[in-house]
Amino acid sequence: MKKLTFLLVALAANPAFASEGPFVSLRNAHFVILVAFLIFVGVLIKFKVPSMLLGMLDKRAEGIKADLDEAKALRDEAQKILASYERKAREVQGQADEIVAAAKRDAQLAAEQAKADLKEAIARRLKGAEDRIASAEAAALKDVKDRAVQVAVAAAAEVLANQMSASDKSGMIDAAITEVETRLN
């Protein structure tokens, strides 16, 4: 520190040597400035300003170092958190892919089941329609047979009525009545 002060004084005094006239005179501005400067430096040294400045600079350096260490720790922690979130994002993406694949499989199975159900429903409806058609055919055939029987009975009745005598008719009626009585008992 003393060397630095001496160096500053020596450098500050160089321009004073270049002035004209006697240097050590209160009329020489350079001399007065040199004396004021030396007094100023002396006061600074007396009140230990350089050591205070160095202490403040050391404290500031320590604060900066602590801030840098804290920033490094925060950066490391942030990198760990980022890695954790990236890992979780990959896991979530994998789960989402699995869910989508499962949904596609379920949709495919549901579509196949719907096709099978539709085929079964169509087969049931076809069977029902075929049964109704067969029933309608049977009913129509029965109606045709009944009508044919009615027509045949009416024709036979008319033929018998025209060809039979009254005594034959009454004998047939009596025979029919006795047959009905025997069947009912």
From Swiss-Prot:
Q: How does it assemble?
A: F-type ATPases have 2 components, F(1) - the catalytic core - and F(0) - the membrane proton channel. F(1) has five subunits: alpha(3), beta(3), gamma(1), delta(1), epsilon(1). F(0) has four main subunits: a(1), b(1), b'(1) and c(10-14). The alpha and beta chains form an alternating ring which encloses part of the gamma chain. F(1) is attached to F(0) by a central stalk formed by the gamma and epsilon chains, while a peripheral stalk is formed by the delta, b and b' chains.
What InterPro entries does the record tag this protein with? ATP_synth_b/b'su_bac/chlpt, ATP_synthase_B_chain
The gene designation is atpF
Give the molecular function GO annotations. proton-transporting ATP synthase activity, rotational mechanism; proton-transporting ATPase activity, rotational mechanism
Question: Which is an annotated Pfam family here?
Answer: ATP-synt_B
Q: Topology relative to the membrane, per the entry?
A: Single-pass membrane protein
Establish whether keyword Iron-sulfur is in the entry.
no
- Family of the protein in this entry: Belongs to the ATPase B chain family.
Q: Where are the transmembrane segments?
A: 29-49
Keywords, alphabetical: ATP synthesis, CF(0), Hydrogen ion transport, Ion transport, Membrane, Transmembrane, Transmembrane helix, Transport
Give the pro-peptide residues: 1-19
Q: Which residues form a coiled coil?
A: none
The subcellular location is:
Cellular chromatophore membrane
Look up the record and report any one GO term of the cellular component aspect.
proton-transporting ATP synthase complex
Chain's role: F(1)F(0) ATP synthase produces ATP from ADP in the presence of a proton or sodium gradient. F-type ATPases consist of two structural domains, F(1) containing the extramembraneous catalytic core and F(0) containing the membrane proton channel, linked together by a central stalk and a peripheral stalk. During catalysis, ATP synthesis in the catalytic domain of F(1) is coupled via a rotary mechanism of the central stalk subunits to proton translocation. Component of the F(0) channel, it forms part of the peripheral stalk, linking F(1) to F(0).
Superkingdom of source = Bacteria
Protein name, UniProt field: ATP synthase subunit b
